[in-house]
A protein has these predicted regions:
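The AdoMet/dcAdoMet-binding core of the Class I SAM-like
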Residues: 37-142
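Rossmann-like AdoMet
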Residues: 1-54, 78
């Protein structure tokens, strides 16, 4: 049994590819040799939609509700070099584990805010984002 402050975290490595399991559920997959490679199909689809909508030079402001190992914001920060990403992660343990384990970009490229998504969104009133990604899971469901 886990709590939001103390989930069970495990990384399974397959060569340069790392899959983060949170409480036994696959949560993120990062290819450390090519962070633009996205293993999860829904992330591939979201990336196709973003690339079809915006030029790679677009200075996008993206809000990610949920982050885990931050595979999607890391990939997008490389595919859209002028983009800035704010990740809202409910678990401080997951956020610090991701920062310690992976070579994630630092602020201002990729900021990680700890908190419950609704509360953080309320604190961001007056801010604007070009894209908002809902990527928060509880167990194996959204």
């Amino acid at each position: 049994m886990s709590t939001l402050d103390s989930p069970s975290l495990e990384v399974r490595w397959d060569g340069p590819r790392a899959t983060l399991l949170v409480d036994g559920a696959e949560s993120s997959c990062i290819d450390t040799s090519d962070p633009t490679y996205l293993d999860f199909e829904y992330m591939q689809h979201a990336t196709c939609a973003l690339q079809a909508t915006f030029p790679s030079s677009a200075p996008l402001r993206v809000l990610h509700l949920g982050g885990a190992a931050c595979a999607l914001p890391w990939a997008w920060s490389l595919l859209f070099p002028s983009s800035r990403h704010t990740v809202v992660e409910i678990s401080p343990k997951i956020a610090s584990f991701a920062r310690e384990t992976f070579d994630l970009p630092r602020s201002p490229i990729l900021k990680i805010r700890i908190g419950e998504a609704r509360a953080v969104i309320d604190s961001l009133r007056g801010s604007s984002f070009d894209v908002i990604v809902r990527d928060a899971f509880a167990g194996e469901s959204l």
